[in-house]
Amino acid sequence: MSITSSQLKSWHPDRPVSKGSTSYHNAVVNAPYYLENLDVLVDLVKPKIRDNETVVDFGAGTGVSAMHLLRKLKAKFNLYLVDNSAAWLGKAYEILSNYSNVKFFLLEKKEERYATLAETIGEKEADHVVCANTVHLIPELENTFKGINSAMKQKGTFTFQSGNILRQDRKKGVLMVDDTIIRVHDIALDMISSNDNFRKYRKDIDNNIEKEKEQRKFVFPDPRPVQFYLKSLKNSGFKYENPIYKLIKIAYKDWLDFLRVKRLQAGILPEIGGKEPSPEEEQDRDELIILASNQLFNDLEMQNPMADNKCFTV
């Protein structure tokens, strides 16, 4: 069944905004590294967007990237926020639903996959699709890209970025998101073995490490090389320009705010409490992640050529 513009109905949340989405939003909405990242994306798409065109923010999350687009772009455009998380999109709705040019669309679950963009908003509906900090989380990338291609008008553009893509010529000391997550996880496990404040978690730790592998990879999937993304674009019918790389400094204090988001902690250290920790487990997990993060930051300051006493580089 095809969808026409006149049939498009904006999604509305059916529940209050979740604490998890608010916590994540607050951790990144004013973080300099996050905004600098978005600045690069907006600068790339700004010359391409004209009045009355439709821009899709794919993987819009809690609305931070959409806020940036609305604030930075002078063109009078229609903005569609699309995400597969009702919780995340609900936060974006809370912030941006008063904008007359903004609509919201939830990617519905279809058996083992989510609906494509074309299945959600229709074919040849979007002039431009932008995607911030999302593509590295998508398992079926080629199918997703094909859905984006089908949803775009002729001569439309698709622009995405991520801080978690592998590339061979990365400068020594430049990290990815995943590098810090793995290191914090490993340091925290060592602390369980050495710090008696957490000795109650030692007994089942080996079993929990094995049991929670899938949860860790669900929240923080293994990074894929840039060539994988370029091949997926080509196989999905896109022509692409050469990727652009930019180094960004992340302050330790800002990154700690990110690492303390409870929903993310369920992927950073799920061996303590899993997806549904008790209040005590949640508190202990947070304390462990704080301690492990501070040790990581100290190690980076002392050993990483792209870090100093305030920040590291991605």
Name each region found by the language model.
Residues 221-236:
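Short alpha-helix
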Residues 20, 241-303:
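C-terminal helical/coil "lid" or tail adjacent to the Rossmann-like core of SAM-dependent
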Residues 115-129:
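A short acidic, Gly/Pro-enriched loop at the edge of an enzyme's catalytic core
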Residues 56-58, 62-117:
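Class I SAM-dependent methyltransferase SAM/SAH-binding core
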Residues 1-50, 64-68, 88, 108-113, 159-201:
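Conserved class I S-adenosyl-L-methionine
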Residues 127-141:
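A short SAM/SAH-binding and catalytic strip from SAM-dependent methyltransferases
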Residues 142-154:
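A short glycine-rich, Lys/Arg-flanked "PGG" loop and its adjoining helix->strand segment in the class I
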